[in-house]
């Protein structure tokens, strides 16, 4: 294959094409979207984690010039909008009615002529709260005498879920020479994207049409839900996700602010915009982690792992409002067996409602993978110290070997490939591990506190195969639509949505790799449901494995038609034609060729008899399998015993994308 033809493709470093507009301040975010007669919305939030709402008095707010409407839960309830579905199959209060269930919950909204008036009016709304005891500990929430977080539920259990074989695991533990136990809490954290949530809605009730700008990682899924809530045909609802200033899982859920903005536009018959403030974002939008984990590792006398047992308490706050595949209530936590050949395992998970903001989003990972890797790596390291083994050696003894692939884990995953020992050995070599250990011992004799940590992890990404993965019944495929115009340039439309990942560069590069077209000649569209094929969006480490694969597949679909056009131009049979990126040529005479640009022109000006003109196709890609990235990290950290100050002495990371 000609080197020049490959240069636009995968493996070559290209400047990110989208960065220029951001550096110049020319990005288009929801806050940049406006329209004539646009009104502005602000949200009143509860200062209490749990309270009964005795009354809401908005009389004083209406005395402020410019206030258009005050929306409460009771007003929405009269329009059948008190509750909205979540992407995990639960329901969530749009605005609190009768009771607030977490600090920061949306209680009322003011819509005014300008944002300053809207925020000032919030201070004039009088809410009479009766404070109630709040449940913030999931263990307490499961006690028989605990008050209900949700009146629509019979208890505070969100779900019960398990994976693996409990009986076989019990037998493995009964035969173990040693059992290592760990209880740990992975605390709640907030993704805190640079841009908070935002929504612009322009609803025309007479035309039955809605145009909505949204900070969404999954525009098509949000369109499906919002169309149902509004009672509009889905094709009449347009969701546009323009430039998004980061998300990290935080912009996958559907939020009450979005729904109320749309409802306000419907009520007022004019455009309404809501820009969330940082306080509201940190108080109420999707948190991550919040797992209480109990892990047990059974080992024989030589340090071979015999079994793994895990119990989880997952705190989801007042509403199960994140986005988990419906079959996997605890996400993909059952990747917890990691890189190790563990014969049997059993994981049981309990999701719990508490008086906290909704939690459980996949922050910087794929569906709970970070928590899983944290637990198994802590367990293996603890076991090594208990057995007086080097942590690297215990890992080597228990890795899945290359010849064992494809490998089925004890919790049901089918790993396709990996060489975990090679990754660890490379990380140890690059870190100078043996020398680090010597320096550690010498330092201890001089009173230095130096720790050396190792992590050898396996992730799971690319959700997912439709037979197993969906959100609210929507299968987790993704899509790409590609058209080659007569000049040989390309227009690519995607079902995934960028929030800063660089899709406009990455996906253009995939087209360049497949077709030999310069990435500069590929226009990439995404984030507009009227101008892109239906897809599940970008979250959970899936955009390139699914959307990227859809892009590669649609390129190859086009090549099938392009080959017939090339054969017609060269006046030979299809079988006489060969392809390399950028050109078709005769197998018997490689200098006789037609370029992809010449083929594109012919598709519109001189197609073969009986062939439909044009050169375009769409691919809905259903992944046959997940992907299993893996790696090994080595870090050395020193702590000052007098001040507690710490510093990283060395950090080496070895990653394989799977």
Indicate residue ranges for each PLM-predicted region.
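Flexible, low-hydrophobicity surface segments
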Residues: 1-155, 182, 257, 464
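Internal maturation/activation junctions in enzymes
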Residues: 574, 583, 587-628
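Short, surface-exposed loop/turn segments at secondary-structure boundaries that line and modulate
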Residues: 71-105, 139-151, 217, 221, ...
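Flexible hinge/switch segments at interdomain interfaces of large molecular machines
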Residues: 30-38, 192-197, 347-358, 482-486, ...
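Glycine-rich loop/linker segments at domain edges
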Residues: 12, 18-21, 86, 155-199, ...
């Amino acid at each position: 294959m000609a080197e020049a033809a490959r240069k636009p493709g995968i493996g070559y470093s290209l400047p990110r094409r989208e960065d220029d507009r951001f550096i110049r301040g020319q990005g288009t975010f929801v806050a940049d979207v406006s329209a004539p007669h646009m009104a502005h919305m602000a949200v009143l939030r509860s200062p209490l984690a749990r309270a009964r709402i005795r009354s809401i008095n908005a009389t004083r707010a209406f005395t402020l010039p410019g206030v258009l409407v005050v929306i409460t839960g009771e007003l929405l309830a009269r329009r059948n909008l008190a509750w909205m579905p979540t992407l995990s199959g639960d329901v969530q209060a749009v605005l609190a009615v009768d009771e607030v269930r977490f600090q920061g919950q949306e209680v009322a909204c003011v819509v005014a002529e300008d944002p300053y008036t809207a925020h000032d009016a919030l201070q004039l709304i009088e809410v009479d709260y009766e404070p109630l005891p709040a449940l913030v500990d999931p263990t307490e929430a499961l006690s028989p005498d605990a008050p209900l977080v949700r009146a629509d539920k019979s208890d505070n259990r969100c779900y019960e879920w398990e994976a693996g074989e409990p009986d076989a695991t019990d037998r493995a533990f009964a035969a173990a020479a040693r059992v290592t136990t760990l209880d740990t809490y992975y605390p709640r954290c907030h993704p805190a994207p640079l841009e908070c949530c935002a929504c612009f809605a322009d609803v025309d009730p007479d035309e039955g049409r809605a145009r909505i700008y949204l900070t969404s990682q999954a525009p098509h899924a949000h369109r499906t839900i919002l169309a149902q809530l509004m009672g509009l045909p889905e094709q009449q609802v347009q969701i546009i996700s323009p430039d998004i200033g980061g998300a990290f899982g935080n912009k996958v859920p559907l939020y009450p602010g979005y729904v109320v903005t749309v409802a306000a536009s419907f009520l007022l018959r004019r455009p309404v915009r809501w820009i969330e403030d940082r306080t509201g974002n940190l108080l109420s939008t999707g948190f991550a982690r919040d797992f209480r984990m109990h892990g047990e590792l059974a080992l024989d006398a030589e340090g071979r792992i015999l079994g793994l047992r895990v119990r989880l308490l997952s705190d989801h706050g007042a509403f199960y409002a994140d986005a988990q595949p419906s079959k996997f209530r605890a996400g993909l936590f059952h990747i917890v067996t990691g890189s190790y050949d563990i014969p049997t395992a059993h994981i049981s998970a309990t999701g719990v409602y508490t008086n906290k903001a909704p939690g459980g989003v996949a922050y910087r990972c794929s569906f709970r993978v970070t928590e899983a890797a944290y637990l198994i790596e802590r367990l293996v390291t603890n076991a090594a110290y208990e057995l007086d083994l080097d942590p690297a050696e215990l890992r080597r003894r228990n890795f899945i070997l290359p010849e064992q692939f494809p490998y089925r884990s004890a919790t049901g995953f089918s790993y396709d490939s990996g060489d975990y020992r090679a990754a660890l050995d490379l990380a140890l070599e690059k870190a100078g591990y043996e020398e680090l250990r010597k320096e550690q011992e010498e330092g201890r004799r001089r009173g230095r506190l130096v720790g050396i940590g190792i992590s050898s992890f396996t992730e799971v990404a690319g959700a997912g195969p439709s037979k197993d993965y969906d959100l609210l019944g929507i299968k987790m495929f993704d899509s790409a639509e590609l058209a080659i115009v007569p000049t040989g340039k390309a227009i690519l439309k995607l079902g995934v949505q960028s929030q800063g990942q660089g899709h406009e560069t990455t996906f253009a590069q995939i087209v360049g790799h497949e077709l030999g077209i310069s990435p500069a000649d590929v226009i990439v569209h995404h984030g507009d449901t009227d101008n892109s094929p239906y897809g599940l969006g970008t979250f959970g480490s899936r955009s390139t494995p699914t959307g990227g694969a859809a892009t590669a597949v649609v390129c190859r679909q086009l090549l099938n038609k392009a080959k017939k056009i090339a054969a017609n131009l060269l006046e030979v049979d299809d079988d006489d034609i060969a392809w390399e990126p950028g050109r078709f040529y005769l197998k018997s005479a490689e200098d006789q060729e037609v370029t992809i640009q010449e083929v594109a022109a012919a598709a519109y000006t001189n197609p073969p008899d009986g062939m439909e003109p044009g050169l375009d196709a769409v691919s809905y890609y259903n992944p046959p399998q997940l992907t299993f990235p893996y790696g090994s990290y080595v870090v050395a950290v020193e702590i000052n015993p007098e001040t507690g100050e710490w510093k990283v002495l060395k950090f080496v990371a070895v990653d394989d994308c799977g």
